[in-house]
Amino acid sequence: MKFNRIAIIAILAILTVVLAGSASAFDLGFLGGGDSEAQQITVGGIDFNIPAGFTENEDYKMDNEKSNSTTGVDYTMSAAGFEDDKKEKAIYILVGDYRDYNVTDQVIEYVLDGMDYEKKTINGHDGYLVQQNTTGSSSLMATEQPVYMFVYEENGDLVFIGATDESYFGDVIIE
C-alpha cells in the first residue's frame, strides 16, 4: 500500500514537469540571462554542476515546497531551471523528498510505465533515460524537438533532470 502511494505521488511530480516541458516544447522561454562560468548548485540537498553559459531564473526555483497530497504520503519538492542566452538550451532539475519513504527502482519503473526508457549509468548513478519528442513551432512550420529526462534515486529521494541535450547529464550529475 505504501508503495502505491509513493508511486502515485512520484508519477504526479514527474507528469507535472513533463507536461510543463511539453507545453512549452521545452523552450523554457521564461528563463533568461547568461553566465560564462560553470557553477555548482544544490537542489534538495543534492549537489549538481551547471555548465558554463546557463543562468538560473529565481522565479522558477522551488525550495522544499510541501505537497498537497491527498494520499497520505507527504513530500516536498525542490527545483531549479536554467537556460542559455538564446533560450534554445535548457536544464531542469527536480528533487522529490518523500520523508520516511525511500524511492526505489521499482517505484521509478512504475512511474515511467508506458514510456520508452533505457536503463543507464551516468557518473556512477544508475537511472532511467527517457527521450520524448515535443512539438514546437518556428515561424512557418511545426518542428519536433527532443527532450531528454534522466530519473534516478539518491539518498532515498527522486531525482529528475530534464534537458534539451542528452550530453548535459554527464556535466550536471556529480559522481
What are these regions (language model features)?
Residues 36-38, 54-56, 60, 114-117, ...:
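Short glycine-aromatic motifs
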